[in-house]
Amino acid sequence: MNSINIAIDGPASSGKSTVAKIIAKNLNYTYLDTGAMYRCATYLALQHGYEAQDVSKILGLLAERPISFGKAEDGSQTVFLGTEEVTLAIRQNDVTNNVSWVSAIPEIREELVNQQRRIAKDGAIIMDGRDIGTVVLPDAELKIFLVASVDERAERRFKENQEKGIESDFETLKSEIAARDYKDSHREVSPLKAAEDAIEFDTTGVSIEGVVTFIQEKAEKIIDMKN
């Protein structure tokens, strides 16, 4: 069966990762968490007290401790930097609040985008992020751009943090998400925007199952046409 690449983009907490993981499982595709890769770079920078001007040092750390993905017993994805598992460490608030400046560094983006493209060259990949359809996989057969209100996204992040035991305040999350939106859409390198040929879908008030069904039906139609 011919496979395709699927790009799912959108702002913070628009449901990209949750949906991408489910669809990957349903289609037996590989889910590549690009956001986790930028979080890994951010985690390394924070661990060593590096700032934007220390780009060569951050790249050096990424070379010393390559990013890889594994699977936990329950099937969920695990993330490693070298031999250290950082699945939960990269989801802490200090990483979340610093990932924008790290991911805006052109050399960091270039290195991680090259890694992502290498992984996707054989197809059957689902990637989510902010510039997958525009920069990383411009030739992806299906491009989706998810949006949702700031309130809805803050609510999702709040529940997610509660489940992971991460302390957070709802109003603070709202302001952090709004600030992240602004940074992501105004940065010089790969700003957050929908690809011209992307299908935009507002997930406000839509269940996860509803979003999955919408995207999967589109994917299956394209796969059928290729076979």
UniProtKB/Swiss-Prot annotation:
Among the entry's GO cellular component annotations, what is one? Answer: cytosol
Catalyzed reactions: CMP + ATP = CDP + ADP; dCMP + ATP = dCDP + ADP
Which InterPro entries does this UniProt record tie to the protein? Cytidylate_kin, Cytidylate_kinase_dom, P-loop_NTPase
Q: Which GO terms describe its biological process?
A: nucleobase-containing small molecule interconversion; pyrimidine nucleotide metabolic process
- Molecular function terms, GO-annotated: ATP binding; CMP kinase activity; dCMP kinase activity
Tell me which domain of life the UniProt entry assigns to the organism this sequence originates from: Bacteria
Give the matching Gene3D superfamilies: P-loop containing nucleotide triphosphate hydrolases (3.40.50.300)
Q: Which residues form a coiled coil?
A: none
Q: Where does ATP bind?
A: G10, P11, A12, S13, S14, G15, K16, S17, T18
- Its primary localisation, in coarse terms, equals cytoplasm
Task: Spell out the Pfam families in the cross-references.
Answer: Cytidylate_kin (PF02224)
Q: What is its EC number?
A: 2.7.4.25
Entry similarity comment: Belongs to the cytidylate kinase family. Type 1 subfamily.
Question: Which NCBIfam families does the entry link to?
Answer: cmk
Q: What is this protein called?
A: Cytidylate kinase
Say which species the protein is native to: Streptococcus agalactiae serotype V (strain ATCC BAA-611 / 2603 V/R)
Q: What is the lineage of its organism?
A: Bacteria, Bacillati, Bacillota, Bacilli, Lactobacillales
Gene expressing this chain:
cmk
